[in-house]
Structure formats: C-alpha cells, structure tokens
Amino acid sequence: MWCARSNAEVRVELTKGWKSGALLKPYTGYDASLLALNDELSDELLYAAHLIQIPDLEQQPSDCGEDEDGAGDGHDETDSFAEMIANIYTLDRACGVCQVLSEYRKKFPLKVEWMADYALLCHKTQAAPLCATTTFVTAFEFAFIMDKHYLPAHGASMVGEFGRRNLFLADVQKHFFLNGCFTPVEGGLVSKIDLNNYSFLVQSVARYAVTSFEGAKSSSWQPNCGAAGQQARHAPAGHGKQMAWAGGATVATRGPGDSTWNSPKTSSTAVALLKWREYARPLECFGKRRHRGLKRSAADADSAGAISMTCVQVAEAEDFARERELVDRAEYPAAQCAAGAAMQCPSKWRFADLTALLMAGTASLPARVAESSGATECPIHEIAAARQATVREYHDRVAEVIMSEQNDRGREPPRFWGRAAKPAAALGPILASVLPHPNGRGGTGGECLLCNLMLTEDYWRAIRLLKSKVVGREDTNTSLFDGVQPSVDQFEEYANTADGGRMLTLLKSVGPNAIYKHLFCDPLCAINALRISPDVLWGSPPSDPEAAELYKAELAARPNFSERVCRGVWILAFAFKAYQLAPPRPTALSTFIRSAESYLKRHGLNCIALEHALTRYV
C-alpha cells in the first residue's frame, strides 16, 4: 500500500539508486517488474558477473596489439581473479550471504516482515532453474528485501556490496543453490555429513569450471587477431583440443583424454567425481532413503509413502497435471497478454531481456552475421556491445572512487582496483553462471538459453510445446535433430507468446544444436526443467495482499524448503558437466557413461546417448 512519506525517506532511496517509492512495493518473489526499480543495482550486478584482468608481467608482448573487441593485448591475465572466485567454492570458506545476515542480526533488530520476505525468496529459489538469469534475479531480489526492511529505518544498504566485491555472485549461488544454507535438515550428524559431501562435489565442479578456463588460457590461449583469429572464430567442433569463439576471446576446449584431472589443484575433485555414486546414494529418492537428510513437508512424505515413484516421475506428473488444468480453464499462460499487445505489459518480458543481455555475444548466444549479406551488425551484437560499454563505465566510475579513498588514506589501491585493472568485458558475464566458464563446443556454450528462458511461465509452456512438436513431427524414424529447425520455423503457429518476437529471435540466434542439446541430450537441462515447480514459482503467493502476507508468514514459521528433484540426480548432473569440460580417458569415460545412464533410467529420465552430449557439447 502506497502512502505519504517524509522527504528524508525519499532521499535515502534515491541515494542508493532506488526509484521513489520502490521499497514500498510488496515482495512477491521472482517479480520481473522489480528489475526496473534500480538501474544502478542492475549495472552493479552485471559488472559483478565479469572477471577482472590485470597486467601479466610474465607474458611476452604480442605482435598484434590489442584486439578490436578489447579482450586483451597479450599482457593481461584473468587467472588471478579466477582463482579468487574459485576459492569461494570451498567447504571451509564461510558463506558470504550467511555472513551478511549475521551482521544484520547483530546490528539491527530482527523484523518479522523481513523474515517473511526472505522465506519467500528461499522458497522460490528451490523451484527455479539453475542458470545465469536466476542467479542475477536472486541477487537483485536479495538486495531488494534487505534494503526494503533496513535502508529506510537504519540506513543499511546492499547496493554497492557486489560492485565493491564485499559480496560475490558465487556467494549467492552457494547460499541459495549449491548448498542451500537455509534448508532444514533432519537425521543428525550422519545426514549433515551426507549433505556436506554433496556440497563438496557440486562446489568442486563449479570451482573446476573457473580454473579450467584458467588452465586452458595459460596453456594454449592466444590473442585473437588477424587471419588466424578469424579462422578460430569459425573452427568446426569435433574431438580433441579446439578453439572456441567466446565473446571476442579465443579459449580452448578439451576432448576425451585431454584431461587436467591429474594436477594437484584438481586431484580432490577427480576423486570426488569417481565417488559420485557413493555421494548420491544417501540422498537419492529410492525406497527408505527418501526421507533421509533434507526435511520434507508432510504432504511430500505422505505422497512418497503412498506411491512408489521417483522424484522425476512425481515432477513430470505434476507438470502434466498443471498443463491439463490450464487446458480445462482455457488459461494458457500466453493468453494472459493479448496477441499484439506485448508492449503494453513490457515488465512481463524483462527476464527474457535480461537473458539476452547476459548471453549475447558469448558462445552460448553468438552474434551470427551472414557474410554474404554484407551486414556488419545484428541485434545480438548490439546487445553485447551495450553490455560491454555498461560494464566498463561502471568499473571506471567505482575504481575512481576506491582509488581516491585509498589515496586519502595513503594506501595503494587493492590489486583488482588499480589503474591497470579492467573488466574482461569481451568474455561476457560468465560469473553469473553456476558453472562459470566461457568455453564453447558444437554450437553450445556454458549457459543454456532454454534453461534461462524457462524462468518465465509463458516460455516454460512454449518450450514444452516446442519439444512436443519436434517429437511428433514425423511418424518415421527420422532424427530428432532434423525436427528442430522446422519446428522453430513454425514456432509462431503453435506458440502464441505475444512477446514482440523475443523468444523466436533468440531461438533462431542460438541455433538448432543448442535447442537439441537442451530438449534431448543434456542431463543438467533435463533436471533443470524438472526442478521448476510451477505452483511455487508462478502460483504463489496469492494475489490478495492479506492472503499473500499470511502465506509468507506461514513459510517463515514452518520453513520446509525442498526442491522437487533429489540431490542424487543433481550429483550425477554436476559430474556429467565436469567430464564435459574435460572428458576422461576412454576407459573411465565408458565406466561413467554406463553408470550414469543406468542411474537416469532408474529415475525414469531418458536422454540420448550421454557420450554424444559429453564429447560433442559443453
């Protein structure tokens, strides 16, 4: 409810970038309209998603100078910053978000209203796909609820904490997704050890993703310039070491056997990956183990005891039931915004616009320009250029303030704030990814476009329609891949998203390989689709303000936060992504594939030959 406020309250909001009255807006969780309430915070989070490059004194000068995309001139390195980020993904590193919450509890009185909003955010994060867009939105909304309850009354703000690197997007991922620090646990020490083992494995894979780029760059990276650089941009995908174009920088990807698992820095991760089945066993959803570890709601427990179904089967049944309900009501999500009136409700598509901003010009969403047309620009390229400009401007502005503060104190500026430090803008905002790396292979990148789009309900439904069209396109034994492009070409005939052409433009830009990978090949994509709980993500809280507050209060009073997919399946997905970045030798690869396929089938989840996706895509 909007009400008159003092000029002092308004000034406090404006000094932190919030639009007047923004902090009075009721919090409903994963609300796309919130992104328009603070442009400064949006720029800050975009900047926080980038690596920082500093001069490499050991690097020999390059003959070709700085490339046109600003990726570096051969004298800069991102390894040091990547190592700092990698150290966040460790069990013996305190969670940054937990530390923030602890500091607030020490300094300020605990507010019941804040507890309710925080509980809703935690609840929603367990029903959202793991992707860059979700990370960004979660960080933004965490800052929103903290400022909503503590900025007007106490002058405490989260705006600027990410930009000054007091908090990292990796902390957000660790708190809300990789570890789930707020999740109640039952079963005592044994269950906590099992969950810590899970956290160790998934964080180790995230850590390896960052350091795998570091290793690839230090061993074979070269500045992309001249004819050699142009050849690298268009190098075909295949086996063995190859070069992939990632937002203007050339990075190496690896083929089977070209692994780095024997180095001291990755040996513990290598051992954990070999033990993935042992880590998964106590946390999987089979038989008696279903109730061990994470505390589940009474409804979940009753359902699990009545019907012997895996988490995958339960999730699929819930999704089909929701679709039937929408059909019966004639309330398809696409009908919520009339055709031709997309621009009348632009806030509805802000998540899609954010996805384009985060992925444009990277290996996950390349800027495709037909050379025969003579064109030099395309929408994806323009979005990427705007993002890079925003990131560089933010860095220059904040770095100037920090260096001035340090000069006043007679100190040298921190290592990553010196005059020679600059954001690796050409690599893109890879730190928003749960597995942060810029590698590309086979027309795919580290971020899946379709996983990101599923954060919007209309797109979740449209992707399910797209998959059904691909599957049902031919009655003959044609390849599923052959049905992707025709189904995309006819997309507007069966998926009336009324989004101003956003989704279709993105689907055409990403290409059929990335779509095929998401729909049929990659276990992480398949599990991401199942992780989305429509009733939680889009069906709560109630639209009535009083009912919504009661709903949030009940969540805070009985915090049974759990996702639909068991952690055993997630362990498999992260192990798969690790081997996708650096496939093991054929014997080890064969052993893993057989075990993984058996595990997926036992859950009722079918994917096309895992060895194809593991060696062909990334």
Curated annotation (Swiss-Prot):
Residues 95-181 are annotated as: Zinc finger 1. It is found in: Host cytoplasm; Host nucleus. Residues 448-525 are annotated as: Zinc finger 2. Zn(2+) 2 binds at C448, C451, H518, C525. InterPro entries: Herpes_env (IPR002597). One of its GO terms (cellular component) is host cell nucleus. GO terms for molecular function: zinc ion binding. It comes from the Viruses. Keywords: Host cytoplasm, Host nucleus, Metal-binding, Zinc, Zinc-finger. Zn(2+) 1 binds at C95, C98, H175, C181. Pfam families: Herpes_env. Its main location: host cell. Plays a role in efficient localization of neo-synthesized capsids to nuclear replication compartments, thereby controlling cleavage and packaging of virus genomic DNA. Belongs to the herpesviridae UL32 protein family. This is Packaging protein UL32. The lineage of its organism: Viruses, Duplodnaviria, Heunggongvirae, Peploviricota, Herviviricetes.
